[in-house]
């Protein structure tokens, strides 16, 4: 495996997805087919089908452990079908969410246990972690205001509509993860202007994947 794997993480409303889109616009002309942009849950037809089940607002009866297991199943398929082949082909993979999301959202947000969810995902991924995780940090109240102000109501999912306490737990878990793994997880203050956030994220990507930009 010779490629480089970088994940993007953050609470809802942190702006990581729009930052990834802006970065893609800048580097795709340089990297061409060497660049793979993907997301979780999703990234291939099977995982996208699982995504639809997980995020469907009609699925209010979904058990929290079921939710965590579905995320892990989607992740395993995504890894096997999309990420590992891309890394084997020496590509730069930028992924919108990965294991840290499950630890934060299901482990802490759903309160089913951060360690338990981490172990579940270690099995699903065979322990594969990104070289770098770009973490977009924003207080929960700011993220939720952004969602309410800017997100298409038709695109609001089951997790977006959770109460503020849920999102506070998610952010706290992310900060614990960053403190525990500072060499991998790089924190960006996502309350800054979008241009500054994108510039910082792009700098981190270029540092982690320097050989693609030489």
UniProtKB/Swiss-Prot annotation:
Entry's EC annotation: 2.7.4.9
Protein name: Thymidylate kinase
Family: Belongs to the thymidylate kinase family.
GO molecular function: ATP binding; dTMP kinase activity
Recorded catalytic activity of this chain's protein: dTMP + ATP = dTDP + ADP
Any Pfam family the entry gives: Thymidylate_kin
Function: Phosphorylation of dTMP to form dTDP in both de novo and salvage pathways of dTTP synthesis.
UniProt cross-references to NCBIfam families, sorted A to Z: DTMP_kinase (TIGR00041)
């Amino acid at each position: 495996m010779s490629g480089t794997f970088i994940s993007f993480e953050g609470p809802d409303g942190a702006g990581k997805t729009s930052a990834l889109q802006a970065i893609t616009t800048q580097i795709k002309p340089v990297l061409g087919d060497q660049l793979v942009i993907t997301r979780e849950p999703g990234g291939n037809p099977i995982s996208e089908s699982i995504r639809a089940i997980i995020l469907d607002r009609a699925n209010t009866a979904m058990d929290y452990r079921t939710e965590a297991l579905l995320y892990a199943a989607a992740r395993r398929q995504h890894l096997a079908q999309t990420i590992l082949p891309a890394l084997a082909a020496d590509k730069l993979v930028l992924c919108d969410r990965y294991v840290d999301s499950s630890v934060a959202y299901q482990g802490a947000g759903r309160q089913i246990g951060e360690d338990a969810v981490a172990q579940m995902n270690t099995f699903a991924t065979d322990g594969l972690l990104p070289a770098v995780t770009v973490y977009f940090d924003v207080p929960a109240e700011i993220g939720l205001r952004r969602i309410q102000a800017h997100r298409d109501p038709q695109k609001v999912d089951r997790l977006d509509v959770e109460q503020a306490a849920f999102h506070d737990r998610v952010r706290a878990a992310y900060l614990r993860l960053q403190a525990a793994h500072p060499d991998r997880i790089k924190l960006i203050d996502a309350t800054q202007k979008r241009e500054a956030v994108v510039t910082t994220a792009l700098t981190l990507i270029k540092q982690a994947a320097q050989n693609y930009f030489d």
